[in-house]
């Protein structure tokens, strides 16, 4: 008799979602690309499926892939085990009522059993004494519990899941149709529609006892004769959408039996060679073609044509679109021939992105530093690497201010009447007439003590009294209108003045890059310097102050280069400080903007923060939520009258309006995706494996006492912003000896 110890682990996982998502009315399409560089087995994606667990499946020319939002698991043929798939060239995917996944290949059909984590070759013999041996072109189910499979040169197969009986409709008894079925679909009445290679469109109302070609009631012609009908999908309002290689995309009204042409030629007069169709909503049809992606608004009769752009990282990765799938979050997956898979999260685009695309009418420079709106509503945008841009918020178009080619590093902007004062790095101040675009004045450092103290001007501020202050690398200047020169403020001599702000009381606040903050009290005509004191937690948190902001409640806020941000408390002449421990993602805070609801938006070195001043609650947005980049830039923000907020970063700038945000209530399912013993991944059915079935479907796990080094990989099956999901877990261990 010997003793053994068994450890039973019971695992409870709960997934929950944090975050809000929205879609702006003027919609832009930003895609996330997944390719072999991200773990995909091959870049030609022929088929896409989301299973009932929430996993995404991608069939390629070299393997089947399961994606959980963070990583891929690849399924390929392995001679060492009979549990693997028998062929790597995947052509079609379908999940049946039992949850099994049917996998079509270029040589036969396989069924993946998720609980067993294994594949089975579907080698059943049909009643007609045939079996599936050639390329599977399509798989789908009907409302009678049957799975239908289209196979090249073999017609259609129908498998009854309950009876386990296979029928083969070779179509050879219909001389007017070939056996090369490319697509098929059942309409609401149960009629089977079949698209063939070179023979057109057919339908059967009696499960292929009879078969009829589609004939247009308008001209009594076989509309799709000699065409390849490659896409068939059922739409709303009793219609079908038909895509073909020659005829583009048409809508077939099943009530009138009439065809309506939707898209046969694109905006350039080029033929649309349709590859795939997806009804994204009752009013929106997505069309995958050889020439890109077409998003067709069925209500308005208009479309958007999206193509790959080598200079645009958010564009499609390839123009040949072969597969489409809408997931349960509302996101759409686009499989391409050369570029892997692209993902468009429906609620991911409320951060509108602007970045250089290599075009003349695009943004010049991507290190966006300053925004300033002129009297015509044009937004002037200063960059640190591309000069000065003019942006029209209504048309969303750019024009480059050509003279700024001579001063590409812009640091400060201030509009004074119709003149834009431009502070530059090492090139002094340029004064631009915004009406004519002419540079009417240049101020630079000379031998005169009343010239600029330094040619690097980082901030410009006009006060309510009309005074103009300039912050430079070596001090503060006040412009003298009468003599058209500058007075140097001795209290700030030698100080790197980074920001200047006049508060509602007329006091002047200065942010310096090494000497804390200064405040000039206009009534007392005195300067006061606020510095960090490591022994005083209510002092300024850091001496490198980046910006100063006054909110609608007349509270003064300061941001710093390494101490977070703070709120000035005038009653005690102290500061309330907020840093990493308060919820900031990073202690470098660049800028603050207040929205119409009183929330403060803070740009940081690691994301965007929405801060509620009354509660201290912070919410962090990152690239996972749709930001252009996680690192923002200095003194780079602007808010329009309608509440649109512009924020600059080192990659361009974003625009958004918080009023358009809506909560995403989708709760992702949570799955254990992988199990490791002693650092090695273990699968069900392997010799010595403790797994009786797939770890994803295991509710308990029995381990021997010597199997004491193990780990799991867990995923919240969320694809819009997978890194924002949080997982709670509870371990319960039962040790049994006997």
Residue ranges and their predicted role:
Residues 26-36, 71-77, 117-125, 165-169, ...:
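Trp- and S/T/G-rich repeat-edge/linker motifs of beta-rich repeat architectures
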Residues 68-71, 113-117, 160-164, 205-209, ...:
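Short loop/turn segments that connect beta-strands within beta-propeller blades
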Residues 20-52, 56, 77-90, 128-133, ...:
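Residue-level "micro-hotspots" composed of small/polar
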Residues 1-29, 48, 55, 148, ...:
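Bacterial Sec-dependent N-terminal signal peptides
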Residues 137, 148-154, 176-183, 188, ...:
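Solenoidal tandem-repeat scaffolds enriched in leucines and small polar residues
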Residues 55-57, 100-102, 146-148, 192-193, ...:
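Conserved beta-propeller blade signature
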Residues 62-64, 107-110, 153-156, 197-201, ...:
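Loop/turn residues immediately N-terminal
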């Amino acid at each position: 008799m010997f003793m053994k110890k068994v450890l039973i682990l019971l695992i409870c996982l709960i997934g929950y979602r944090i975050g809000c998502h929205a879609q702006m009315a003027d919609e832009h399409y930003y895609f996330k690309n997944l390719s072999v560089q991200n773990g995909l087995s091959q870049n030609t994606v022929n088929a896409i499926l989301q299973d009932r667990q929430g996993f995404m499946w991608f069939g390629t020319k070299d393997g089947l892939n399961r994606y959980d939002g963070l990583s891929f698991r690849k399924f390929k043929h392995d001679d060492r085990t009979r549990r693997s798939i028998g062929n790597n060239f995947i052509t079609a995917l379908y999940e049946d009522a039992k949850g099994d996944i049917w996998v079509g290949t270029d040589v036969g059909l396989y069924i993946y059993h998720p609980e067993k984590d294994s594949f089975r070759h579907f080698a059943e013999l049909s009643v007609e004494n045939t079996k599936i041996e050639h390329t599977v072109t399509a798989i789908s189910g009907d409302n009678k519990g049957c799975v239908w499979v289209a196979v090249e040169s073999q017609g259609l197969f129908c498998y009854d899941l309950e009876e386990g009986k296979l029928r083969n409709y070779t179509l050879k008894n219909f001389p007017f149709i070939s056996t090369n079925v490319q697509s098929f679909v059942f309409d609401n009445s149960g009629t089977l529609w079949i698209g063939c290679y070179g023979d057109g469109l057919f339908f059967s109302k009696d499960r292929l006892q009879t078969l009829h070609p589609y004939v247009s009631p308008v001209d009594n012609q076989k509309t799709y004769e000699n065409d390849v009908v490659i896409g068939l999908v059922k739409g709303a309002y009793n219609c079908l959408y038909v895509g073909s290689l020659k005829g583009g995309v048409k809508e077939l009204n099943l009530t009138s039996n009439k065809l309506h042409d939707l898209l046969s030629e694109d905006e350039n007069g080029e033929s649309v060679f349709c590859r795939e169709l997806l009804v994204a909503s009752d009013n929106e049809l997505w069309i995958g073609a050889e020439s890109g992606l077409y998003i067709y608004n069925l209500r308005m009769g208009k479309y958007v044509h999206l193509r790959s752009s080598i200079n645009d990282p958010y564009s499609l990765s390839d123009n040949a679109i072969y597969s489409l799938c809408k997931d349960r979050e509302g996101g759409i997956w686009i499989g391409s021939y050369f570029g892997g898979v692209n993902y468009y999260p429906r609620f991911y685009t409320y951060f509108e992105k602007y970045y250089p695309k290599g075009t003349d009418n695009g943004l010049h420079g991507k290190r966006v530093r300053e925004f300033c709106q002129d009297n015509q509503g044009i937004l002037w945008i200063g960059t640190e690497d591309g000069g000065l841009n003019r942006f029209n918020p209504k048309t969303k178009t750019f024009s480059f201010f050509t003279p700024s080619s001579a001063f590409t590093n812009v640091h400060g902007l201030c509009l004074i009447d119709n003149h834009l004062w431009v502070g530059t790095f090492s090139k002094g101040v340029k004064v631009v007439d915004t009406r004519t675009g002419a540079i009417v004045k240049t101020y630079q450092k000379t031998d005169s003590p009343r010239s600029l103290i330094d040619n690097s001007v980082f901030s410009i501020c006009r006060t309510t009294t009309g005074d103009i202050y300039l912050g430079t690398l070596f001090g503060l200047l006040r412009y003298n209108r009468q003599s058209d020169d500058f007075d140097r403020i001795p209290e700030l001599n030698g100080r790197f003045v980074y920001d200047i702000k006049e508060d509602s009381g007329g006091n002047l606040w200065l942010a310096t890059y090494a000497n804390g903050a200064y405040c000039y009290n206009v009534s007392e005509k005195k300067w006061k310097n606020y510095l960090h004191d490591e022994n005083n937690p209510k002092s300024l948190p850091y001496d490198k102050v980046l910006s100063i902001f006054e909110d609608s409640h007349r509270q003064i806020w300061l941001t710093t280069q390494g101490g977070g941000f703070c709120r000035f408390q005038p009653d005690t002449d102290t500061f309330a400080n907020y840093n990493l421990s308060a919820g900031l993602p990073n202690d470098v805070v660049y800028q603050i903007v207040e929205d119409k609801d009183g929330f403060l938006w803070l740009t940081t070195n690691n994301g965007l923060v929405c801060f509620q001043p009354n509660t201290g609650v912070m919410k962090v947005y990152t690239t996972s939520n749709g930001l252009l980049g996680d690192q923002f830039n200095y003194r780079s923000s602007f808010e329009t009258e309608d509440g649109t907020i512009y924020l600059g970063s080192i990659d361009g700038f974003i625009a958004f309006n918080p009023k358009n945000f809506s909560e995403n209530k989708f709760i992702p399912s949570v799955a254990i995706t992988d199990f490791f013993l002693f650092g090695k991944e273990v699968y069900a059915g392997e010799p010595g494996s403790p797994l009786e079935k797939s770890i994803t479907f295991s509710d308990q796990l029995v381990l021997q006492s010597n199997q004491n080094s193990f780990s799991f990989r867990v995923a919240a099956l969320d694809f819009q912003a997978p890194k924002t999901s949080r997982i709670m877990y509870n371990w319960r261990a039962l040790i049994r000896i006997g």
